[in-house]
Amino acid sequence: MSDQSSDPVMEQLREQISETDLAILEAINRRVTLVQRLHTYKAEQGYDLIDTAREDWIVQYLQRCNRGPITPDEVATISRFLLDLTRRAGGPSRGGE
């Protein structure tokens, strides 16, 4: 077997993967921050914090926008995970978006 750690193509691809992972993390944190702001606004206005119709729309929208290679079912799984994560991180009221 050859030494994979010195393969320049592999190093470049891994670096791109790491950069993409950081961009995903930043996007998730940005989403959580926005949801927290939305929860504050909803609470101030007396709106319901959880909008399941909106959550369903988000999942369907992302499935329609997906150009692969992940499947629509995988998009739904990821979307539902992110919705659950942001609901849990949304603050003391624990509402969703």
Feature-to-residue mapping (PLM):
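Domain-level signature for soluble enzymes in the chorismate/prephenate branch of the shikimate pathway
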Residues: 1-97
